[in-house]
Amino acid sequence: MDVIDELPRAEFAFPGPLRDRLVAAILSGAKTSTSALLVGYERANEPLPEVGERAAVVDSEDRRVAVIETTEVRVLRLADVDLQHALDEGEGDESVAQWRAGHETFWHSAEVRAELGDPGFTVDDDTLVVTERFQLVHTI
């Protein structure tokens, strides 16, 4: 077994076009941050990422394509996410409002609501978000 196979998986969005775009942005170096709902970690009983932790990025075909290392983790109110974080997500957003609109659409999707087990889930200014900065260590 290769060392890469022992690393935890870093999955961005759900398999499909969005994941493909996010993985491409990671591989190009454009994406150096991400965000997730704190409630998602809690419902899955998963620990938050930790600084120095490495993970294998998986693509839509479930292949490990890169290794990233966490460099910062913050838990913030959705209203407190800053412009630098939004820009560093590498999705082309030019403002926090644009970033938030895109993320609200994703977080209100049927897939996220199903994953959370809450068909009526919505976010607001006080929703807690885990923001994570990472660096690309290498591609596979």
Language model: regions and residue ranges:
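Mixed-charge, low-complexity intrinsically disordered regions
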Residues: M1-V67, V73-I140
